Amino acid sequence: MGEKVRILGIAPYKGLVTLMKRYAGQRDDIQLTAMLGNVETGLSLAKEHYRNYDIIISRANTASRIAKGVPIPVIDIGIDYYDVLLCLKTAENTKTKFAVLGFRSLTTIAKSICNVLKIPTDIFSINTTSEASSLLDKLKEQGYKTVICDTVPYNYAKLIGITPILLTSSMESLKAAVDQAVYTWQTHLSLIHI
């Protein structure tokens, strides 16, 4: 076996840092360092540390910001249909008025699931982090008690009294991203040696 792929994992929430560390221990082909950083903090960490790594994995908006700011490949952990379905079922079980709020990577999947399973759910897409607060204020005024969201609106929802359900990535989503990172790096190396 060749050298280990050096992966920097930048997670937008603590649970994903823990998941990354646990999963890294199961693989002998990677050296994964996990750090906590959401959007701008994640970008700062990436800029500070990328020179010591071959590739970066992160999630959603944080991954997108990092990809625009560093010269090494960035793999988005992504959001799995199963991840969203678990959150929808959790929200349904609260028996409260709930909505899905997030960037299109979340809301597109949520719309698909809700259409197929005929789950009546209000779904709101945001394009920038600044939109989240004003939209949450409107949801509060309209009587929403629960919101499925990513890390960007999570804390503000708690602050104004809406119960947030954080969309978390499953081990399967993380495994797929790490596999993609290893494949991307191996492809890069094979092209260098042609």
Task: State what each model feature region is.
Residues 29-48, 79-87, 119-138:
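A short, well-structured beta->alpha microelement
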Residues 30-31, 65-104, 115-123:
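A broadly used, surface-exposed interaction patch
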Residues 2-23:
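N-terminal basic/disordered segments at the start of proteins
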Residues 46-78:
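Helix-enriched interaction subdomains in cytosolic or periplasmic regions
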Residues 192-194:
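Conserved small/polar residues in nucleotide/adenosyl-binding loops
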Residues 83-92, 110, 131-136, 173-182:
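Short, charged, surface-exposed secondary-structure boundary motifs
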